[in-house]
Design a protein with these regions (language model features):
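Extracellular polysaccharide-degrading/modifying enzymes targeting complex plant/algal/animal polysaccharides
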Residues: 1-330, 335, 381-392
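Short glycine/acidic-rich loop motifs that flank beta-strands on beta-rich extracellular proteins
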Residues: 34-35, 251, 278-284, 323, ...
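Short glycine-/aliphatic-rich beta-strand segments at the starts of folded cytosolic domains
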Residues: 579-596, 675-692
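Short amphipathic alpha-helical segments
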Residues: 595-610, 689-715
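An amphipathic, aromatic/His-enriched active-site/gating alpha helix that lines ligand/cofactor pockets
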Residues: 611-616, 629-656, 714, 734-777
Length: 786
């Protein structure tokens, strides 16, 4: 009613509103029967804005849910549980019909829809038959009984799918699962992303859910539409007499909607909480996303690849957009400040189409099933997803949006393929000083279309964001991810760290800090703090500039990233799941194969799958060496041994000596790119001398500091010594293009202690088998495996 009153004051041009209209919300929960609707007639002006805000120190909540009361202990038999273990209540109704929902919150904590696996565990599919649109799964637990409404939740590359089950046919310890339309056809016809079968990394992970027969763990719930009851297995410490159980009802809590000719303007919303929003499309049509939660309406593989825009394209896709708690279309000069978006089934805030010059600042986005903030058109439902977007009326384009100083945490917890902030075909957007944590997939995704062709996208800036604890469930992921051509766009001075380890990932090594994907063009990617150079430039277009993205950038970048005052209080809400493992950072290592007749193409293909950073292949005589920063060194070594059974395969890890210029040389910055030179020798057979060699290297920085200074003088970026048995591997890294022959003499220039050190080392070293008499260190030649 306050909005209507304000609207009338505007219509009558009442003099009392010349300085603006303030609509003040008092403390408390406002349960909504329908979304709040703001339209062009509610617009303010620059001189007389409309401000909807919380009273001082108040916390008004716009609540789209319903509280479920009347809980009793269920005295029936469920899975042999003691009577009274499970609670039961009458399911809430509206107009005589049971309200449907896919989420439930108990005392503000999301409960778990009853599922087939325990805790965070998932099973692996056995096979997928696209022709029959069926899937075989392990089915040892015969207590699970099929009933209508059951679903399969499946991981497929960078997305998930929710598939409504049509039937389960049990055969021994396996079962064939069929699905309802339309998702059954879409799931089996679309090529990307799809279920995978992998001997090395395991098949697609899945669980079944939404069945009474799976209600067997604390925190799980089930809504029975047949008898109108809801069942809940309480967690420890929950009191049946005081518990607050909330179910979402409305899919949308606030809609701000104008049109191209009459947009909504000059409205501020401050200090308002938006809580408990629903999203039911997965229950009605299934949910098979293409990427970033944009669900497929139709998709299939092209029999003959290629489109006018992309000759290699092999698939076609048309997508829809998930609902949001707050949806904005055709609006400008709006401001969302110090608001809270929590306990939401799908997207938090969506600036969908035709929005410009809006500000999203200092807000909390927490416990959200989908993306926290969506901005811009991705693809209209009638527009194929791989085409560049160039509307005739550029007023449709979202532009000049500012998204700063927001905390986004514990999001993408229903649709694991959604992200922290997703921007589609946008221009002149600024995403800065946000903190993003506890995300199932990517932190910030910018762009759409998978094409280097020109579109409306340009002048987009991602600056000084703090992104950490992401990739919780899915891989092919990054802290910051881009698509397509975006002239004059930049990714600069962000701080990205701490990547979750996903036990379900199709590719355990495809996690990244920065990822410019298909068609990404004309980006400046500079001065981002990342702990290791784990980045990917996949099928990029022209004009990208990469500079100084490493742990060696100015420490001030790390300190300045993230939320600023006066919004730093939001940091108290940061979620980090300490029960979840983190990725181990890849470390420099050497793998050596000794043999002949190597199949270099097969070796290169295997090594590529391990995503080694700065990998190089080197050879001396019958010795082949792989060097770079890698995870799972022993796993790669074993795989190489299987591939090359006639070869001796050795690994070299944990260097016995490690000089790095950044740590040892005063006022130094490492070169942006390096060349690595690899040499090998043996230690002498005398074990006492071997130990003396190691002892000298352990104390070299203290007792022989001139040696490290010599390396500084020569501009060595890094010098590492690895050991396996008696054999040593020496790696010397210099600025790319520099000559080691020219740099090496500078180590001894005016530095007699280095000459003494080199003479001392000679008594500990000898050549490996195959070297010439009096030959000690031998150089490997770098190879091009292609």
């Amino acid at each position: 009613m306050a909005l209507r009153k304000a609207r009338e004051l505007r219509r009558l041009n009442d003099p009392s509103i010349k300085d603006g209209i303030h609509i003040i919300l008092m403390d408390g929960i406002f349960y909504l029967d329908e979304p709040v609707f703001i339209r062009p007639e509610d617009s303010g002006t620059p001189e007389s804005p409309t401000i909807i805000e919380a009273e001082f120190n108040a916390k008004p909540i716009l609540n789209g849910g319903v509280q479920i009361n009347g809980w009793k202990k269920y005295e029936g038999n469920i899975h042999g549980l003691k009577a009274g273990t499970v609670w039961v209540a009458d399911a809430p109704k509206k107009a005589g019909k049971i309200i449907d929902y896919r989420q439930l919150w108990v005392n503000g904590k999301k409960a778990i829809r009853a599922k087939s696996t325990s805790g965070t565990k998932m099973e692996r599919i056995l096979s997928w038959d696209k022709n029959s649109e069926t899937c075989w799964i392990p089915f040892k637990d015969k207590s699970i009984v099929f009933q209508p409404g059951m679903e399969m939740f499946i991981v497929q590359w960078w997305a998930i799918a929710n598939l409504r089950i049509k039937d389960i046919m049990v055969k021994g310890d396996s079962a064939k699962v069929s699905f309802l339309q339309p998702e059954s056809r879409i799931q089996s016809e679309h090529p990307w992303p799809a279920p995978w079968i992998s001997k090395n990394n395991g098949n697609s992970a899945f669980f079944l859910n939404n069945g009474m027969s799976m209600l067997n763990e604390p925190g799980e719930w089930y809504l029975n539409h047949d008898n109108g009851k809801i069942y809940y297995y309480p967690r420890a410490g929950e009191d049946i007499n005081s518990v607050k159980v909330m179910a979402p009802v409305l899919e949308n809590l606030l809609e701000i909607k104008g049109n191209a000719d009459f947009p909504v303007k000059h409205i501020s919303i401050k200090g308002i909480s938006f809580e408990y929003a629903n999203w039911l499309r997965p229950s009605q049509n299934g949910h098979v996303p293409l990427q970033a939660g944009m669900y497929l309406l139709d998709a299939y593989k092209l029999k003959i690849p290629g489109t006018p825009d992309k000759a290699s394209l092999e698939n076609q896709a048309w997508v829809g957009r998930p609902r949001a708690a707050v949806e904005v279309n055709f609006a400008s000069n709006l401001k969302f400040e110090a608001c809270s978006f929590q306990h939401l089934a799908s997207t938090g805030l969506d600036l969908n189409k035709g929005t410009n010059h809006n500000t999203i600042i200092g807000n909390l986005f927490k416990d959200i099933g989908g993306t926290a903030i969506n901005v811009g058109v991705f693809s209209d439902e009638s527009f194929e997803a791989h085409l560049p977007y160039n509307p005739k009326d550029e007023r449709d384009v979202c532009s000049n949006e500012v998204i700063t100083d927001n905390l986004i945490t514990n999001v993408a917890n229903e649709d694991w393929g959604t992200v922290g902030i997703a921007a589609g075909f946008v221009k002149n957007i600024t995403i800065a000083h946000n903190e993003i944590s506890d995300v199932s997939y990517t932190g910030i995704s910018l762009g759409w279309g998978w094409t280097p062709s020109s579109s409306v996208m340009r002048n987009n800036k991602i600056t000084a964001n703090k992104i950490h604890h992401y990739a919780k469930h899915l891989h092919d992921v990054a802290g910051i991810y881009t698509l397509s051509s975006q002239p004059n766009s930049s990714i600069e001075e962000n701080y990205i760290d701490n990547v979750y380890h996903s036990p379900y990932a199709h590719d355990p090594y495809l996690w990244l800090y920065l990822y410019t994907d298909e068609g990404s063009s004309f980006f400046s990617v500079k001065n981002n703090w990342i702990p290791v150079e784990k980045i990917l430039k996949n099928n990029n277009g022209p004009g990208n500039v990469w500079e100084h993205n490493s742990p060696y950038v100015d420490e001030a970048i790390k300190k300045n990233a993230g939320i600023r005052n006066p919004y730093k209080y939001l940091e108290n809400e940061v979620v980090i799941d300490k029960s979840w493992q983190l990725q181990e950072l890849p470390e420099n290592a050497v793998i050596e194969l000794v043999g002949t007749d190597f199949d270099m193409a097969a070796i290169a293909k295997l090594v590529k799958s391990f995503r080694i950073i700065n990998q190089g292949f080197y050879q001396w005589e019958n010795h082949l060496v792989i060097y770079g920063k890698m995870n799972s060194v022993e796993k790669l070594k074993n795989r190489l041994a299987l591939l090359c059974p006639q070869a001796e395969v050795k690994s070299y890890q944990n260097p016995v000596y490690n000089f790095t210029k950044f740590e040892r040389c005063e006022n130094s910055k490492p070169a942006q790119e390096w060349d690595d030179f690899i040499l090998t020798a043996n230690l002498v057979a005398d074990e006492k001398l071997q130990q003396a060699y190691l002892d000298h290297h352990k104390t070299q920085f203290q007792k022989w500091p001139e040696v490290a200074q010599g390396f500084c003088n020569a501009n060595f970026q890094q010098l590492q010594v690895f050991k396996n048995g008696r054999q040593l591997m020496l790696v010397i890294s210099v600025p790319k293009g520099a000559s080691l022959d020219e740099l090496n003499p500078k180590t001894t220039e005016n530095n007699p202690r280095v000459i003494e050190w080199n003479a001392l080392m000679k008594k500990y070293q000898t050549g490996i088998e195959g070297t010439k008499p009096n030959e000690t260190w031998v150089f490997f030649n770098k190879l091009d495996p292609n």
